[in-house]
Design a protein with these regions (language model features):
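Glycine-rich phosphate- or other oxyanion-binding loops that anchor nucleotides, phosphorylated ligands
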Residues: 25-154
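Short N-terminal binding/cap micro-motifs at the start of the first secondary-structure element
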Residues: 11-15, 53
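A short, Lys/Arg-enriched amphipathic alpha-helix followed by its capping loop at the start of a domain
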Residues: 14-20, 36-40
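Short, hydrophobic beta-strand segments that form beta-sheet elements in well-ordered domains
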Residues: 4-5, 148
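Extreme N-terminal starter segment of soluble prokaryotic enzymes
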Residues: 1-3, 42
């Protein structure tokens, strides 16, 4: 089963509305929307803004629903000039943009004791790219694969 997380209602509402056989389950202060999307079992949930909310929600998806893959969807900023509104970015790796221990010899974004970057599941990333390319949406928008950054600074 696949879990799909969005921080805000606007990021998950159309997915929830598209679920076939939708049921809602309340757990831990979250409303999980379970159903089928393109004949695949999914659980869609609004996590709330921030890394902690996303982590808590992801843990509940794993423990309560047995998801084996999690997709985070939503609105984001970009540092590159080659992306437009509604373009897709699929991560190849991720890092924190709001964590700085460089004074202690760590790389920017690196949490002590952890790798400086988190490597994405290449198989899942490739599936997302394949699915995107099969949608009419892909004719008007592009998809790129690369480094993404996460943080709680706005």
């Amino acid at each position: 089963m696949t879990g799909i997380i969005g921080a805000m209602e606007a990021e998950v509402q159309s997915l929830c509305d598209s679920l076939e056989g939708r049921t809602q389950i309340e757990e831990g202060g979250y409303v999980f929307n379970k159903g089928k999307l393109f004949n695949k079992d999914v659980v869609v949930v609004k996590s709330g803004i921030g890394k902690v909310n996303s982590a808590l929600c992801t843990q509940l998806l794993i423990l309560k629903f047995g998801v084996n893959q999690v997709i985070n969807t939503g609105i984001a900023g970009a540092t590159g000039g080659n992306l437009g509104i509604f373009d897709f970015v699929v991560s190849s790796k991720a890092l924190y943009h709001d964590f700085d221990t460089t004074a202690f010899g760590y790389k920017p974004g690196q949490v002590p004791g952890m790798d400086p970057e988190f490597i994405a599941d290449e198989k899942l990333s490739d599936l997302v790219i394949k699915a995107f390319s099969q949608m009419d949406f892909s004719k008007e928008h592009k998809i790129v694969k690369g480094l993404v950054a996460s943080g709680d600074q706005f």
